[in-house]
Amino acid sequence: MKKLFLIGKSLKHSISPFIHNRILSEFDIDAIYSNLELLDTEMLKEFVEMVRKDEDVVGFNITIPYKEDILEFCDEVSEDVRIIKAANTVKKEDGKLLAYNTDWIGFKRSLEDRGVDVKDKKILVLGSGGAAKACIYGLYRMGAKEVFVANRTYEKAEKLKEVFQDILKILPVEWLRRYEFKYDIIINTTSVGMFPNIESSPFDFENYVAGVPVFVYDMIYNPLKTAFLKEAEKKGIKIENGLKMLVYQAIEAEMIWFDIVNLSPNFLLEILNDTEKNFGLGIYKVIG
């Protein structure tokens, strides 16, 4: 049996194994996907050494906090990873480790599903880590020309200017000044508000008087409706959580590992529905 992993920290509540194993079962692939918590970069190094030696390991996903650290252990990177400088998917092929990023694809497709147009919009991204980089790259691929970025450590937001200098304009915003500008779209890429700290929010809409956004997105999927999204919804703003992004990026990763094609139109909704039944998270219905 082939092996796949999700590596990172604090994976206790991750539903990625359920989603990936659901995909593997759908296509009768003899493989299993498991979580593996790594406490530090030394454990990351040991894991990579194990992957290279174990012929049954096909690849793995990476989540917080190793999406950037993993690059030094990979032999080749895709074009989007070269730009983003963060990877969430690695495939082992002919003894080499190849790094990809499917996060931006999942993010982009989930926005497209909602009919969100980012062209000529004022967009604020909260956070500046690997998830933020994938988000910004996805926005660029959808036609965005500039993005405001607010991070608690201003210098980290400032560094994104260099990362994306060749493709779009990054406008760093000091964390305490994030309420001073009018935005059409606000996107949270931080872990603030994630289970179990569900009362926390990275943005206080009661303090935001510069204008009302038309769309608010939270990459968090547990809970499905974070405090951030609840506050936005009370203001009449359209909202979206990160569950569709999670499923879309998982499907893209499986396509990289196993060349899966011909997904049924309802397959995404079937997985979302299965997630609802098994975890009490979902709010989606299968169509047709």
Curated annotation (Swiss-Prot):
Homodimer. The gene is aroE. It comes from Caldicellulosiruptor bescii (strain ATCC BAA-1888 / DSM 6725 / KCTC 15123 / Z-1320). This is Shikimate dehydrogenase (NADP(+)). Keywords: Amino-acid biosynthesis, Aromatic amino acid biosynthesis, NADP, Oxidoreductase. Involved in the biosynthesis of the chorismate, which leads to the biosynthesis of aromatic amino acids. Catalyzes the reversible NADPH linked reduction of 3-dehydroshikimate (DHSA) to yield shikimate (SA). Pathway: Metabolic intermediate biosynthesis; chorismate biosynthesis; chorismate from D-erythrose 4-phosphate and phosphoenolpyruvate: step 4/7. The keyword Oxidoreductase applies. One of its GO terms (biological process) is amino acid biosynthetic process. Shikimate binds at S14, I15, S16, T63, N88, D103, Y221. Pfam families: Shikimate_DH, Shikimate_dh_N. It is an enzyme of class 1 (oxidoreductase). Its EC number is 1.1.1.25. The active site is at K67. GO terms for molecular function: NADP binding; shikimate 3-dehydrogenase (NADP+) activity. It catalyses: shikimate + NADP(+) = 3-dehydroshikimate + NADPH + H(+). Belongs to the shikimate dehydrogenase family. PANTHER family: BIFUNCTIONAL 3-DEHYDROQUINATE DEHYDRATASE_SHIKIMATE DEHYDROGENASE, CHLOROPLASTIC, SHIKIMATE DEHYDROGENASE. NADP(+) binds at E79, G127, S128, G129, G130, A131, N151, R152, T153, Y154, E155, K156, M219, G242. The keyword Amino-acid biosynthesis applies.
